[in-house]
Amino acid sequence: MKALILVGGFGTRLRPLTLTLPKPLVEFGNRPMILHQVESLAAAGVTDIVLAVNYRPDVMVSALKKYEEQYNVKIEFSVETEPLGTAGPLKLAESILAKDDSPFFVLNSDVICDYPFQQLAEFHKRHGDEGTIVVTKVDEPSKYGVVVHKPNHPSRIDRFVEKPVEFVGNRINAGMYILNPSVLKRIELRPTSIEQETFPAIVRDGQLHSFDLEGFWMDVGQPKDFLTGTCLYLTSLTKRNSKLLAPNSEPYVYGGNVMVDPTAKIGKNCRIGPNVVIGPNVVIGDGVRLQRCVLMENSKVKDHAWIKSTIVGWNSSVGRWARLENVTVLGDDVTIADEVYVNGGSILPHKSIKQNIDVPAIIM
């Protein structure tokens, strides 16, 4: 089987992290985001993966070579010379996606969930039509494009309603699809939208179905959602009794959902959790309080610091008695001085912060 992952451009929404690494290589749950997807696709029998990108960073090429060997898949880049939207990249990769009649998966690189690729492929085969989109239920459908089914048909899609004013349903497009190669005939090689142009055309022919996603789902393309997605992912691991989580019997674990890389060092009298990810070679001093945060590789948190709703980038250091909260993001190699308060700062790489940041701001 084949798959195309829509990676796109420079990941500006996730800056300052994406100033250091391309978004697919930023670690989510201590593994590059793209690895969650590659692993799930390979497990479902996918052998060819295409990454649709606007630019091809060399660092990605070498990282993905490693995954090719590890998961026995072929990973190719399809590089757009101009941004082609969400449908154009499929046409650009037609030579790979249409090399046989088997259907192919398409997914957005920002989506984290329990990927249901195997079940999705079986469902798609059963109904025998042209396309299936994965949908997820949301509490506030008015913010999204909602999927409406045909009367008396649980999966065949009748129409899409963008940001509905009155309730028409609560299922939204989850950014994952399985499509027959015939769909490519509907797409021109130009900037074009799969959601607004291709899918409505397939719906008019009665050929598009939806598949309900069980479990959690999050688009983690910006820091606030990256943190929420981390909470959902850790909760999902807890439900599965995953060995990736620190046992609640550890003296520092407070409230569960804590992932600690084996190489990290944790001081005395710390309270860590709920919903914390600690990366490789992280050093945490004594009496530190961490909740709902991500600490990336080689970062350092000194004694008695207090960190909540924050992403601490690689090689960064947080001083003694410092306090970080309110979706603060430290880029690579940022230093926060002792006793400094940061309230929602987005701090670019290699900066040193010696003064409080009382209101959310970008520090360049």
From Swiss-Prot:
PANTHER family in alphabetical order: SUGAR-1-PHOSPHATE GUANYL TRANSFERASE (PTHR22572)
Cellular component, GO, one term: cytoplasm
Source taxonomy: Eukaryota, Fungi, Dikarya, Ascomycota, Pezizomycotina
Gene Ontology terms, MF aspect: GTP binding; mannose-1-phosphate guanylyltransferase (GTP) activity
Key words, A-Z: Cell cycle, Cytoplasm, GTP-binding, Nucleotide-binding, Nucleotidyltransferase, Transferase
Function: Involved in cell wall synthesis where it is required for glycosylation. Involved in cell cycle progression through cell-size checkpoint.
Source organism per UniProt: Emericella nidulans (strain FGSC A4 / ATCC 38163 / CBS 112.46 / NRRL 194 / M139) (Aspergillus nidulans)
Protein name: Mannose-1-phosphate guanyltransferase
Pathway terms, separated by semicolons: Nucleotide-sugar biosynthesis; GDP-alpha-D-mannose biosynthesis; GDP-alpha-D-mannose from alpha-D-mannose 1-phosphate (GTP route): step 1/1
Pfam families: GMPPB_C, NTP_transferase
